[in-house]
Amino acid sequence: MSTIRCDIVSAEQEIFHGEATLVVATGELGELGIVPKHAPLITRLKPGKVIITTVNGEQLDFAISGGILEVQPQVVTILADSAIRADTIDEVAVRKAKEEAERILANRGETIDVAKAQQQLVEAVVQMQALERLRRTVKH
């Protein structure tokens, strides 16, 4: 079976390193499916999901807040602004962060950092979506 190495790295740490048969991510122009021997490319990633299908057929679900995807003949590298594996997301903390960001944006004052609050909201929504996908997968 043909594989491609996949690395997901954020500013804080390496999130994933391993062999994959398929990597799915959301680029600026839509969803990308990367398989072994894919043509080289570089694209910006939107906040959303990254799904890696491992050699044994397991699907690993990650939530990213955006970044860059680079494909070379033998490796896919995702440089994520932030990334987390769906099965490690703290749902209570994510809901709290989402509510806080929504509260800040609803009560805009002159002293708030709107871009930061919007980014916090996007990250929380992406993580909640990853949790929902994980729950649907586990139920089946």
UniProtKB/Swiss-Prot annotation:
MF (Gene Ontology): ATP binding; proton-transporting ATP synthase activity, rotational mechanism
InterPro entries tied to this protein: ATP_F1_dsu/esu_C_sf (IPR036794), ATP_synth_F1_dsu/esu (IPR001469), ATP_synth_F1_dsu/esu_N (IPR020546), ATP_synth_F1_esu_C (IPR020547), ATPsynth_dsu/esu_N (IPR036771)
Sorted UniProt keywords: ATP synthesis, Cell inner membrane, Cell membrane, CF(1), Hydrogen ion transport, Ion transport, Membrane, Transport
CDD domains xref list: F1-ATPase_delta
Membrane-topology descriptor: Peripheral membrane protein
Intracellular or extracellular location(s): Cell inner membrane
One GO CC term on file: plasma membrane
Main location: membrane
Family of this protein: Belongs to the ATPase epsilon chain family.
Role, per record: Produces ATP from ADP in the presence of a proton gradient across the membrane.
Subunit structure: F-type ATPases have 2 components, CF(1) - the catalytic core - and CF(0) - the membrane proton channel. CF(1) has five subunits: alpha(3), beta(3), gamma(1), delta(1), epsilon(1). CF(0) has three main subunits: a, b and c.
Protein name: ATP synthase epsilon chain
Source organism of the structure: Xylella fastidiosa (strain 9a5c)
